[in-house]
UniProtKB/Swiss-Prot annotation:
Residues 83-142 bind DNA. This is Homeobox-leucine zipper protein HOX5. It is found in: Nucleus. The lineage of its organism: Eukaryota, Viridiplantae, Streptophyta, Embryophyta, Tracheophyta. InterPro entries: HD, HDZip_class_I_plant, Homeobox_CS, Homeodomain-like_sf, HTH_motif, Leu_zip_homeo. It comes from the Eukaryota. GO terms for molecular function: DNA-binding transcription factor activity, RNA polymerase II-specific; sequence-specific DNA binding. Expressed in seedlings, roots, leaves, nodes, internodes, flowers and embryo. Residues 141-185 are annotated as: Leucine-zipper. Residues 180-254 are annotated as: Disordered. Keywords: Activator, DNA-binding, Homeobox, Nucleus, Transcription, Transcription regulation.
Length: 350
């Protein structure tokens, strides 16, 4: 037997045989894992179970060597006891009690921590850790709540701002509209005045229109109506009389010239009457006396071509002369009718 293949180990013998008997280990053709020195020795006898050795050496991070001292074994057992335990889950009753305690006071005092741990059957350190995590979550939720509140306030302010802008635009439009209406109202009287003046300019004068539309003589011998404001002379029947006098009874008054056409009414121009106010005023100033129309038998009377006789004072004679100078003359010929009418009209307007 090869002495290099015989090993005596009391430690291995004690672990293999709890009774404390010593064992001789004979080498042989063991596995390659046992090394060249322990070839042929079963792994179970040597106490080299891979599962056990790997679990015991997991904390050290490397496989424990075969030869170890007593101090190393004690240190290994100490570290196995200090291995972290599995995380425990809290029950629903514990969570509810912790939540109520946190709502009452989120700060945890030592006396309160001990009392909660005793009531809940938990370690004081576990209670402290739960409160710390709960405060962190509460701060996060508080920030979220503050953000939501500030965002809602911002949205409300933005809506109010947009509403104010809309009201401002509406009021500005109303101001512009009212200003335009006011300007139109201010300019409308002046335009109306201009329009009225233009209409007045376009419309002819009443006297002019009446004079332009009035005929002063007709072929039938009738005189048209005079324009407004013109004093109507008396009719020849009222003036031509044998003993006509004025209101004072002294024979003074306006001189009247009557042209009477008794024959050929269709061929001659007939003048009904003519009233000379200027001659009357001159006569009243001069007090020349009373002159009246007389028949053709009276002495000093002037007899017309048609058989009418009348007396004329000096002023009336002058007016008659002017009337005659204007060309108003009686003719028996029908071809001179138009010339006589034009001459009489020119004298009337002069």
């Amino acid at each position: 037997m090869d002495p290099g293949r015989v090993v005596f180990d009391s430690g291995v013998a004690r672990r293999a045989c709890p009774g404390g008997a010593q064992m001789l280990l004979f080498g042989g053709g063991g596995s390659a894992n046992s090394g060249g020195f322990f070839r042929g020795v079963p792994a179970a006898v040597l106490g080299m179970d891979e599962s056990r050795s790997s679990s015991s050496a997991a904390g050290a991070g490397a496989k424990r060597p075969f030869f170890t001292t007593h101090e190393e074994l004690l240190e290994e057992e100490y570290y196995d006891e200090q291995a972290p335990e599995k995380k425990r889950r809290l029950t629903a009753e514990q969570v509810q009690m912790l939540e109520r305690s946190f709502e009452e006071e989120n700060k945890l005092e030592p006396e309160r921590k001990t009392e909660l741990a005793r009531r809940l059957g938990m370690a004081p350190r576990q209670v402290a850790v739960w409160f710390q995590n709960r405060r962190a979550r509460w701060k996060t939720k508080q920030l979220e709540h503050d953000f939501d509140r500030l965002k809602a306030a911002y949205d409300a302010l933005a809506a109010d701002h947009h509403a104010l802008l809309s009201d401002n635009d509406r009021l500005r439009a109303q101001v512009i509209s009212l200003t335009e209406k006011l300007q139109d109202k201010e300019t409308s009287p002046s335009s109306a005045t201009i329009t009225t003046a233009a209409q007045e300019v376009d419309q002819p004068d009443e006297h002019t229109e009446a004079a332009s539309t009035t005929g002063f003589a007709t072929v039938d011998g009738a005189l048209a109506a005079p324009p407004p404001g013109h004093q109507q002379p008396p009719h020849k029947d009222d003036l031509v009389s044998s003993g006509g006098t004025n209101d004072d009874g002294d024979g003074g008054g306006a001189a009247v010239v009557v042209f009477d056409v008794t024959e050929g009414a269709n061929d001659r121009l007939s003048c009904e009457s003519a009233y000379f106010a200027d001659a009357a005023e001159a006569y009243e100033r001069d007090c020349a006396g009373h002159y009246a129309l007389s028949s053709e038998e009276e002495d000093g009377g002037a007899v017309s071509d048609e058989g009418c006789s009348f007396d004329l004072p000096d002023a009336a004679a002058a007016a008659a002369a002017m009337f005659g100078a204007a060309g108003v003359v009686h003719h028996d010929a029908a071809d001179d009718e138009e010339a006589q009418l034009g001459s009489w009209t020119a004298w009337f307007w002069s």
